[in-house]
Amino acid sequence: MKFKKILLSLLICLSCFVQAKNITISRLTCEMQEGLVVVEGSPRLGWVMESPENGTRQSAYEIDIREAFTGRSIWNSGKVYSSQSQLVSTKGADIRPDNSFNYSWRVRVWDETDTPSEWSSEAKFRAVPERLSSGQWIGAITRQNAHLPEGRKFHGGELKKPEVKAAWEAVDTLAKKSICLRRTFQVGDAKEGGANRKPGKKIVEATAYVCGLGFYEFSLNGKKVGNSEFAPLWSDYDKTVYYNTYDVTEQLRRGENVVGILLGNGFYNVQGGRYRKLQISFGPPTLLFELVINYEDGTCTTVHSDNNWKYDFSPVTFNCIYGGEDYDARREQKGWNQIGFDDSHWRPVVIQEAPKGILRPQMAAPVKIMERYDIQKVTKLNADQVASASVSTKRTVDPSAFVLDMGQNLAGFPEITVRGKRGQKVTLIVAEALTEEGACNQRQTGRQHYYEYTLKGEGDETWHPRFSYYGFRYIQVEGAVLKGQKNPQKLPVLKNIQSCFVYNSAKKVSTFESSNRIFNAAHRLIGKAVRSNMQSVFTDCPHREKLGWLEQVHLNGPGLLYNYDLTAYAPQIMQNMADAQHSNGAMPTTAPEYVIFEGPGMDAFAESPEWGGSLVIFPFMYYETYGDDSLIKKYYPNMRRYVDYLKTRADKGILSFGLGDWYDYGDFRAGFSRNTPVPLVATAHYYMTVMYLVQAAKMVGNDFDIRYYTSLAQEIMVAFNKCFLHKDTAQYGTGSQCSNALPLFLQMTQDADEQDNYRPDADLNEKVFANLIKDVEAHGNRLTTGDVGNRYLIQTLARNGEHELIYKMFNHEEAPGYGFQLKFGATTLTEQWDPRQGSSWNHFMMGQIDEWFFNSLVGIRPSTTPKQGYQKFIIAPQPVGDLKYVKASYETLYGTINVDWTCENGTFTLNVSVPVNTTAVVYLPGGKEPKEIQSGTYQLVCAK
């Protein structure tokens, strides 16, 4: 495509008045988060600015921090001449953990003409409470009395051993029961329970800190606080325990109040009972609670977890993160979490052992019910189908069974509204696939997992599980009929049923649309799979394993960062990785590491450089996106320990362990890498982690490490080329796509000169790249890479301008490709390119094309200058194939970038919006020189 004559036209007229450019401050953040943020030490603040005029930028700012209630001044920055508007330091501010009040802050800015804006609205934050970690943990039984087995080896064949079975069967059944806890307290008295009460004191702030393990539901005076599911986010409880912070000022009333907590097992206490991937217990369900109430007169009262609480069994009679959930509504105690309830028959709690992990505030967004889906199709199973399905599903299918197609594969649970007689039961079996008979099929995803609801018989009853979820599209209902259906057996009537799509509520920050149907649908397919697996961690699948496999964190990292606000989620992922790191520096393949893979054939699953490398690689992706180097600096010691560990495993610079290019493609069932040698992939990632560590050493200012690891990287690169490069053919390894793409991507195509010094070899690079293209073309413009190689193949082609080839590789409806999955009827990305081969139908590990959609088709990329984090960025769209248009938006820390281009009738038209206080470097297709534009809205036109 050749373009000539560039026309640049402004869409926004310049103001004719000499005045302030009407800068308004629209979004205040603390540690890049909105709302009430809990901080350790002096926080970093940020703000987004808007202006109706082009070219607006900040020249100075002033920050004012006060105590929210009293208005007492804490810190003022004065006028600071700087364009920085994100991650602005407040070092020197007296933020004290013993202060129970919130802090408020505001900011004003000056534009490039030194004209000030109005003060912004106020935002709040509060310090991490220093006394919370000394609180008491309460529950129904201590770990010691529960006789819970210890260790992380309980999976697979280990669970079948008689001694292991006996150990788990010896556990006190009380240790896995869901319980309700309650406590009454007074509000409005100068001294709670004291003789000199002063009624009528006004509450100015009330903050609750809650940690209920494994999961909890928190209520005040009978009403649920917040709308999260599966709180707190799960972790390695021996290392880190998260608690949640709630502003409950409006929920309290003067006089008597009641706090209620419902506890479930979660990943804290996986004891099995039905399907389970593993078993592990950190202890029986437990609660840590603290409520701090500040009054207008300056006094403060605290309600905390202690032996004044009571508990009883909840209506949740079974709950397992892997196996499902049962609920007996007959066991509900009306008003149990409200004033006036008689709890004389409830039991006193016991003081339990605290989890070993460090208490940390949960900064990442909670998991919530984010979407709901209604019935799309109903199928009643006949007698023959019921009989046959009872064999194929290995469970007795009730003759009343019918199957609902909800239209969307997702992670979550059903919600029902049902009416029937007391004691009647409704069973819900969920699955993402169907058997030949049309019944729900969990063979590939872990069986048995189901939900059972026992009615109380009091009108309409609405219920959904609280402590378990699964991946499913279909719901098999047994023991009920749908409203309007014949009901000769007088079964309960389902008046409504929905699929609840449950995932992390981290903000979606982008949109993408093109004129290509397959690309649009592939983007949606990947998005649904990502959301299904974006829970407390990035899981591999929402049913069979629910484990945080680490390779997808960096291999899909750019795509994830283009689509979601990971400012708080990513630091938690890093904490999980640091917690999972072994004492010798080794990194497991999963974090949290709930199971240690041991035994014959399991070594590759225990640790693999492509998986563990996320510890080193992902912080740099975070830094490029947000301009925040804190993760690199915080986890530098962990990165170094991991690289040092890999060095101990290397033989003359070559690593020979791991999973390699997992699930690569060919005329075989996907699994272990077949096309590309495992040592090649492992060693390339070893080199990559060392190169990133060198960059990290420069950022932390460690000169010794810079020299040492630069030398190590050179040694690895030399060993790699000596071992895998075939000079006569300019092929690496087997000559597979992954074999050649990896060294090209990492710029390892080097050769020795006459003095035996290795230097970049342009001729070699060109020949290897030509071989890569030949292989893609020889396979009919199809890939042969897998989970690991996909990104390197796509991005190597893109970096070298082969966008037309990438377009051909994915603009079709054959396997391997997204179009084939769409043609098959998939609604989430599947584990294998050909879903008919089995395995999970809800994996996002093959979703690397999303990065290309944004950094190439749309053309938005962070700048390569030191100004990371999109204060300066690139827009370089690539019109390819028969694309007529692409339009997208991407919300950065500084505001939203909009890109909308069309290519019609020989003219390429690009419309862009650049946020205030940022600069875009625009490359037009075919143009030689970029154009640098400041904030505002522009149209750029190229005539063919």
Segments (PLM) and residue ranges:
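C-terminal capping/lid segments that line or modulate ligand- or cofactor-binding pockets
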Residues: V259, Y327-D328, E545, N563, ...
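Active-site acid/base region of carbohydrate-active enzymes
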Residues: F215, T286, H304-N308, D312-F313, ...
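Alpha-helical support elements that line or immediately flank enzyme active sites
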Residues: A206-V210, L220, F413-E432, I475-A480, ...
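Helix-terminus loop motifs that line ligand-binding clefts
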Residues: K223-P232, D236-D238, E436-Q448, T567-F672, ...
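Hydrophobic h-region of N-terminal signal peptides that target proteins for export
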Residues: L11-Q19
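Non-catalytic C-terminal accessory modules of carbohydrate-active enzymes
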Residues: Q279, T286-E290, V303-W336, G340, ...
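Extracellular/oxidizing-compartment recognition motifs
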Residues: I23-R544, E551-Q552, A568, N584, ...
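Sec-dependent signal peptide recognition
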Residues: K2-S9
